[in-house]
Amino acid sequence: MPQPTGTPTWIDLGSNKAESSRAFYQGLFGWSFADQGEELGHYEMVAKDGNIIAGFMNVEGIPGPDGGPLVDRWDIFLAVDDIAARIDLAKKHGATVISEPMTMPETGSFALITDPTGAAIGL
């Protein structure tokens, strides 16, 4: 059963110090990291006891929306019923699209926006 629209459904960690982040979360929680390959920008699926629980990305050298470096951070993604329709609706309510929808194997489509205050959120 899909999660209700607007509820948390996924988390992502972006880190400029990928090795340090991996070591920390492996040691703290026993997480494992699986590189999804060049086609997906070396995005990594994070698993705990064989269950995929999060995503991870080495953001070192990737420019942010303002042109400066991306900061280390956790991003939260909210479930939507129709990603294209929700992005259009978000724009009508003052959102800015950071990244257009793309599809990830096993998890579905996602996009990043900022709300009118500048807070980033994933859909």
Regions inferred by a protein language model and the residue ranges of each:
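Core segments of cupin and vicinal oxygen chelate
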Residues: 2-5, 9-52, 92, 102-108, ...
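Vicinal oxygen chelate
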Residues: 7-16, 44-46, 64-89, 109-114
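A generic structural signal for ordered alpha-helices
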Residues: 2-3, 64, 68, 96, ...
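Short loop/beta submotifs within extracellular cysteine-rich repeat domains
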Residues: 33, 52-54, 63-64, 85-86, ...
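Hydrophobic alpha-helical segments and helix pairs
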Residues: 85-123
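A conserved beta-strand-loop-helix scaffold within acyl/acetyltransferase catalytic domains
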Residues: 59-61
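Short, structured motif recognition centered on aromatic/hydrophobic residues
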Residues: 8-12, 25, 31, 56, ...
